[in-house]
């Protein structure tokens, strides 16, 4: 892959690298799924925002630098090369923010985007329900109009970041008697609202990365409706496209992991079979392929093209790629992967954490089975049955 960067983009890369060298934490922060780790990651978001590094492709008036997506990819490459912290604000800045920019009113943009950029408001997702996980159109949580408020009643589950976050974006049913994709609306809800209860859900490592949310007649101002009333399915699909497509998982994240995998292999190759080396090569090649495909896609977007089914293909590729990469690391380490500290620990258990998270990749952001169905129907033209 040969990419010709402009002189401005080359200088931008130097600026990012120098800033991160000075400001990025020297040690890994605690898990953002703990209160301590969440607070420290929020402070890091504020550090990024202070010098407008948190969202370089956002408009200047909302806390960004007004740069293009190629510059964002450059930033991501330097960010992950510096081993900077994961973005606790990702639900907001990568998923909700572009949705607000597309569907929100000017008042909503001015109200929600600046505190999102600054790290003052951290957002959670509130989509899935006990009987509406992958089948999001089966949502039953309802929001009944009462004057200038909606009254929300129902339950959400697997709400990422909801244990410690400030706000959530929720898909609810606003039209009585509606079914499936019709009659849904997307509304923005403060998580400290009266009548809203959070119940943490422990992950494999014991940390509460998700929460159940119970809405008992929670009153939400009508101005928190994002997009058209009863037209929330299209708004939600736009957000899902951002989640599956370009923004949530940049190639740099996986390239950095692949570089660490190569280093890990070199340190242990004397006791490994040649087949493991081939797996490492494949993992590294996959990340480079994903990077090339992403640059190509970004170039098309900047030329005015829209993306649709590419988001599903993207999600399929990065989730399977991540799982293969981390499974290869586990093969190299064997039982040592279980150790988080001590003389025999490798990278403080980081690979094990990454492996457990990679197992969820084919599930969140729409299961890979659903993505394959989308591609089969919309790209290949195959029948639904």
Where are the regions a protein language model picked out?
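Internal helix-loop-helix
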Residues: 49-110, 114-120, 161-167, 287, ...
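Glycine-rich beta->alpha junctions and the first turn(s) of the following alpha-helix
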Residues: 3, 7, 196-292, 361, ...
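A structural signal for short hydrophobic beta-strand segments in well-ordered beta-sheet cores
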Residues: 141-144
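A short, Trp-centered hydrophobic/proline-enriched beta-strand micro-motif
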Residues: 119-127, 171
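C-terminal helix-coil-helix/basic helical segment that borders enzyme active sites and/or dimer interfaces
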Residues: 28-35, 266, 270, 274-277, ...
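A short core secondary-structure module
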Residues: 148-149, 153-199
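Glycine-rich phosphate/pyrophosphate-binding beta-alpha loops
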Residues: 132, 157-162, 204-205, 360-367
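Glycine-rich phosphate/cofactor-binding loops in nucleotide/flavin-utilizing enzymes
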Residues: 2, 70, 74-75, 95, ...
């Amino acid at each position: 892959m040969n990419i010709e960067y402009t002189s401005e983009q080359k200088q931008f890369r130097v600026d990012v690298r120098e800033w991160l060298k000075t400001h990025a934490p020297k040690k890994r922060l605690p898990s953002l799924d703990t209160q301590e780790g969440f607070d420290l990651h929020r402070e890091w978001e504020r550090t990024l925002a202070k010098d407008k590094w948190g969202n370089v492709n956002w408009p200047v008036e909302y806390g960004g630098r007004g740069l293009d997506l190629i510059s964002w990819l450059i930033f991501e490459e330097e960010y992950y090369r510096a081993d900077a912290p994961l973005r606790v604000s990702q639900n907001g800045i990568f998923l909700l923010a572009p949705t607000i920019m597309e569907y929100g009113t000017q008042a909503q943009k001015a109200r929600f985007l600046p505190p999102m950029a600054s790290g003052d408001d951290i957002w959670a997702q509130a989509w899935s329900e006990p009987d509406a996980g992958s089948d999001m159109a089966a949502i039953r949580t309802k929001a009944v109009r009462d004057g200038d408020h909606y009254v929300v009643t129902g339950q959400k589950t697997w709400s990422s970041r909801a244990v410690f976050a400030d706000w959530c974006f929720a898909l609810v049913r606003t039209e009585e008697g509606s079914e499936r994709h019709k009659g849904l609306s997307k509304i923005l809800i403060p998580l400290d609202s009266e009548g809203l209860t959070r119940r943490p859900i422990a992950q494999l490592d014991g940390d509460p990365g998700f929460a159940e949310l119970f809405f008992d007649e929670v009153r939400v101002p009508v101005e928190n409706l994002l997009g058209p009333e009863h037209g929330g399915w299209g708004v939600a699909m736009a957000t899902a496209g951002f989640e599956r497509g370009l923004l949530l998982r940049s190639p740099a994240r996986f390239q950095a992991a692949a570089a660490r995998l190569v280093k890990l292999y070199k340190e242990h190759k004397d006791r490994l079979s040649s087949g493991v080396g081939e797996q490492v090569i494949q993992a590294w090649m996959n990340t480079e392929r994903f990077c090339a495909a992403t640059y190509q896609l970004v170039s098309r977007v900047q030329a005015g093209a829209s993306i649709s089914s590419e988001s599903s293909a993207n999600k399929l590729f990065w989730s399977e790629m991540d799982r293969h990469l981390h499974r290869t690391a586990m093969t190299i380490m064997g039982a040592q992967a279980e150790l988080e500290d001590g003389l025999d620990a490798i990278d403080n258990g980081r690979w094990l954490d990454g492996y457990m998270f990679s197992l969820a990749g084919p599930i969140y952001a729409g299961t890979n089975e659903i993505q394959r169905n989308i591609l089969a129907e919309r790209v290949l033209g195959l029948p639904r049955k």
